[in-house]
Amino acid sequence: MQQQSNIRNFAIIAHIDHGKSTLADRLIEYCNALEAREMCQQVLDSMDIEKERGITIKAQTVRLVYKADDGCVYHLNLMDTPGHVDFAYEVSRSLAACESSLLVVDASQGVEAQTLANLYQAVDNNHKILIVLNKIDLPAANPQQVQQQIEDVIGIDASDALMISAKIGLGIKDVLQAIVTKLPSPNGDSQSQLKALLIDSWYDSYLGVVILVRVVDGKIEKGMRIRMCSNNAVYTVENVGFFSPKKQISGVLYTGEIGFVTAAIKQVADCRVGDTITDDKKPCAQILPGFKPNLPVVFCGLYPSDASQFNHLKDSLQKLRLNDASFEFEQESSGALGFGFRCGFLGLLHLEIIQERLEREFDLDMITTAPSVMYKVYLNTGKVIDVHNPADLPEMQKIKSMSEPWVEATIFIPDQYLGAILGLCTEKRGVQVDLTYVNGRAKLVYLLPLNEIVFDFYDKLKSYSKGYASFDWQIDSYKQSDLIKLSILVNGNPVDALSTIVHRSKAEFRGRELCKRLKDLIPAHLFQIAIQAAIGSRIIARETIRALRKDVLAKCYGGDITRKRKLLEKQKAGKKRMRNIGNVEIPQSAFIAALKITNKD
């Protein structure tokens, strides 16, 4: 049993690409947690997609054993967290399990938007912050300026910040020494009843559900009967252990320790993240506060390209949800695309990752509809409904008003790109809240509609700033807006998969662009096809695909003009009848390309 005073629990937080996972690699290497032949880049990033993109998606935990200069042996529980805003829920779970944080800042880039967002979360959790300036070996590194920037922007003392280069291993011992001397040991009563925080859960095909826990009071050991406080489910503990980063069975976890527990739990849904785990016979008097679950903010439809793959898609989504409880899905059907699922995500990167995992791990070919957000619709009857699928929107005459979610966005940009970014925010209906300057960089705070962000805001932001802008957002509130449903009609029939909810000021432009795009994508038929964009019953844009013409006079070699006229009249009547009863085949490529309209508008 390790003395409680010799345990340190800490998370590594930083902006994307500032070197969190590389620092974790060096700490693991220095503590000899893995043999040299087992070391590789981003050891804790286990998914192929994480290694390929160079990002962390799932927060990972590892226990390191470090012998300090004072001769004592310390157990360091390290949690590597994601940097992207979409995976902020992973960060919040890790921070709730720790007492302190290493704030890693790139010495060449300085404070970025995610640096601030993650730091504020750590401060909310009453963490002791240890500042680490990484990449000091780069020619562009300016540690003194970044120290000043940290003090100016964040307001915390950076005079004793640690100078390191995680890539070449410079200053790693200083980091470990600072962890054991400056960071606090965990609080908690080892003699009290068991009280543990459920940090994460995932599914293992052999062990069932594996749960990651932080023991706050008491201890958890093999054979113990434990109870989940949220649903009073009782389980018998089968295995207890920790990651080093390999799985190690210890049989018991004491106060202040972080590790995994298996107890023949069948479904991840039974293990609510943030739940309190206690002893079934001697339950704790008060449960832990936990943390609020993240609600999905971006929604889209996923449909199999081949209708016969529907059940395979359903099974794949259920399997993915076992390891990622943050995304939701429900069955829906579309007249144009058949049966599929309406899915909710934490952001566009989250959507992209789930889509890529479905295609790669489950070999699925899918159609993704345009992303949308959750709107609040106030009906004339006084009832309020939530709508994220345009097909579910009631008729406009039944609606009193509509509200859309707005976000508070923080943007860091070099001075020379400020004008272009201010123009972009205004174009996206933004409202400026704050503008400050720190060391040649501008910090912008804007209120923006989430509907404008989920399409192409991030791409344009990077394009206008030549890649130098950093961006973070959080939901602010719902605000009333002049929103309408834009319907696309092909030959007078609405195509539900192409309907969108847009602001009235952008409806005409969006409608015209969609009609033009569809005209190029839908193949010509033997009859004329009208493509129309409509708001309610009012047509705002139209394009016409001309009919293919069969030469019915080819077999007439001379003869009376009435013979030719008779054949032409017959063709004309046939086309008229075909226009009334003929179905327009819209290829799937047309849906996919038309839904990308927003990337270029």
Curated annotation (Swiss-Prot):
UniProt membrane topology term: Peripheral membrane protein
Q: Give the keywords, sorted.
A: Cell inner membrane, Cell membrane, GTP-binding, Hydrolase, Membrane, Nucleotide-binding, Protein biosynthesis
- Which Enzyme Commission numbers does its entry carry? 3.6.5.n1
- tr-type G domain sequence ranges: 5-187
Q: Which cysteines are joined by disulfide bonds?
A: none
Q: Where does GTP bind?
A: 17-22, 134-137
Q: Name one GO molecular function term.
A: GTP binding
**SUPFAM superfamilies named in the record:** EF-G C-terminal domain-like, P-loop containing nucleoside triphosphate hydrolases, Translation proteins
Q: Does the keyword Cell membrane apply?
A: yes
The record's section on PROSITE patterns has:
G_TR_1, G_TR_2
Report the catalytic activity.
Answer: GTP + H2O = GDP + phosphate + H(+)
Quote the cellular component terms of the Gene Ontology held in the record.
plasma membrane
* Compartment(s): Cell inner membrane
Q: From the UniProt record, give one GO term of the biological process aspect.
A: positive regulation of translation
EC top class named in words? hydrolase
PANTHER family, per database record = TRANSLATION FACTOR GUF1 HOMOLOG, CHLOROPLASTIC, TRANSLATION FACTOR GUF1-RELATED
Task: Give a short account of what the protein does.
Answer: Required for accurate and efficient protein synthesis under certain stress conditions. May act as a fidelity factor of the translation reaction, by catalyzing a one-codon backward translocation of tRNAs on improperly translocated ribosomes. Back-translocation proceeds from a post-translocation (POST) complex to a pre-translocation (PRE) complex, thus giving elongation factor G a second chance to translocate the tRNAs correctly. Binds to ribosomes in a GTP-dependent manner.
Q: Which family does it belong to?
A: Belongs to the TRAFAC class translation factor GTPase superfamily. Classic translation factor GTPase family. LepA subfamily.
Q: Write the protein's name.
A: Elongation factor 4
Origin organism of this chain? Orientia tsutsugamushi (strain Boryong) (Rickettsia tsutsugamushi)
Gene responsible for this protein: lepA
